């Protein structure tokens, strides 16, 4: 683990998630394909892009339509993905992909998303994302 600005150690996967968010956010902001932004970051990045970062970005890209439909179906009345702040929209995509398509525990993916939202977005974002993503994950679980 590497130290953060606050002096606390930041887990490797947490850093990879943040970097994936940076790439997805940049692509969204600039109107570019996320795969293109990932490629540019991979060629220029120091330190190098971690495989987990690339896996997250590629996974969101490959599953974005399905992820957006899941998130959109669980937004509060009157809300759309486009109404969400860019950071929140991309955090939601990242968390849903990670929770449903990787070996990461769903609770961990949700908690990491909420933590990043509390650091990077509005005061209301952690609560909104927690509620929306908890509903998405609850409904996406296979019936036992």
Predicted regions and their residues:
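N-terminal interaction/assembly modules
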Residues: 1-144
